[in-house]
Amino acid sequence: GIDGDFTLNNVPKGSTLVISFVGYETMEVKWTGTPLNIILKDDTQMLDEVVVVGYGTQKKVNVTGAVSMVDSKVLESRPVQNVAQALQGQIPGLNMSVGNSGGALDASLNINIRGAGTIGDGSSGNPLILIDGIEGDMNTVNPNDIANVSVLKDAASSSIYGARAAFGVILITTKNGISGKTRVNYSGNLRFSDAIQKPNMTNSWDFATYFNEAQRNAYGTVIFDEDDMNRIKTYMSGGYTDPTKPEYYGTVAGSNGRWQNYGGAFANTNWFDEFYESWVPSQEHNLSINGGNEKITYLLSGSFLDQKGLLRHGSDKFQRYTLNGKISVKLADWVTMNYNNKWTRENYDRPTYMTGLFFHNIARRWPTCPVVDPNGHWSADMEIIQMEEGGKQTSEKNWITNQIQFVFEPIKDWHINVEGSLRQYNEKY
């Protein structure tokens, strides 16, 4: 009823009743056969949950702005490359989109909170990202080192940061050492990547048939004559079985003595399958050590990520190394020192030929063109030789962050924070 009265029928004596209501703690009561008078307690734990806002923390019950939080359990359970990918779909109003770099292994996702609204060319709608209180790139942080992520969505929540927080704030707090026995934690995963939207490429017979029809309608001639069509049919049926014969490779020598690629070739190549790998393996390893006592706590963590790209030819790989150290020392009853050091290195290799024209040309290559010629060389006019032998672009990026903080408490609950930080970044190609 309206006063919380309820009646249950056919309940055996000695049964345990579970009573719950929104905003109250769940209670279990054993029924002895007599009427029960049950009083539920307020669920203060939900309201006491601490979220990071501005320069400090608040209980949820006191937060009036729009704030969302994700804890470490969510981030650690997702085998992804970086923090931005781990946050996808986890926070309402946090939108991710692919930028101009596309799906390159070192590319960053575009992030906006509750949509983007900008004024004038060159303006940006990106949120302010703070890692342990200082601005940084979230993709340089190992997701396993994160304790929680708070997203401040509205003006009331982010106003303390001023104009730079006009599009919201993302606050990332990394884990601290925990007093007690030394604990060693290791986690690793092996994952596989695949391209999920590869276009379907027509086979050589259908391609040659349609091409001849178009050529005949336009010019009254054909590109693939009857001999070519017969060779295509034989090749697709596996009729060429002698690797010492040029027909085995889907080509013959032309009148100029060169192996033919376009007109005159009769292989059956799916160029999307040729350039893109399937089920590419990647691996990640995380190791952390933490412990301490009432006076001092420490944490040391490291990680290694080896992410392979989807390109079959040439070097396409991304590697990230991270090292994070934290120590907290109680120098006196009224002063505590916190020191934090982070180091991240990213190495990325990709073929020099990786331009927009490369992806454009994959779809333009005829399926009749062979991958290799009868001499075992990569076929001319195809991108494979540029990918394999045209060199590679190598980049190395390093981030080093040092933070130190002194927390003074001259009287109970009056905290004075004195902080300093130094960030270093360098890259070479």
Region locations from a protein language model:
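Short, small/polar-rich motifs associated with maturation and membrane association
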Residues: 1-324, 336-337, 401
